[in-house]
Regions:
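P-loop NTP-binding core
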Residues: 1-134
Length: 134
């Protein structure tokens, strides 16, 4: 298809990183980007299918570590520096509303929210649109 794609794993479980064969050892991850340890471009790993910014379990504590004003815009500000390098940037988020998912919402142009065809899944999906007001 010839499109340049970046996948950013925002889930502390790191399933996207694992599924794409990306190792988070000895490499910067999205946690480092949030903590200001590196620029987002330093965390990009070249993959066979697409470029990836890996996650790791440290990301699970980022909610408590990021307390400053504007914490919901960290990802958007970092992505501005690399946005023109990619045709698509896919953000894989955890399945709960948190500082990570809010960062994904503020950084995104569009949302795709996969869900089970069940009433409880449908009720849970009602939160994001009303949450996004920026």
């Amino acid at each position: 298809m010839g499109k340049k794609v970046l996948a950013i794993d925002l889930d502390p479980q790191g399933n996207l990183s694992f599924s794409l064969g990306i190792d988070d050892e000895d490499a910067y991850t999205i946690y480092d980007v949030f903590k200001g340890n590196c620029d987002i471009s330093d965390a990009v790993q070249k993959g066979g299918i697409c470029d990836v910014i890996a996650s790791n379990i440290l990301l699970s504590g980022v909610e408590l570590e990021l307390t400053g004003v504007g914490r919901e815009y960290i990802l958007r500000e970092q992505m501005e520096t690399i946005r023109d390098e990619y045709d698509y940037i896919i953000l894989d988020t955890p399945p709960a509303l948190s500082v990570l998912t809010i960062n994904a919402y503020t950084a995104s142009d569009e949302l795709v929210i996969p869900m089970l065809c069940e009433i409880l899944s449908l009720q849970g999906i009602a939160t994001p649109p009303s949450t996004k007001r920026w």
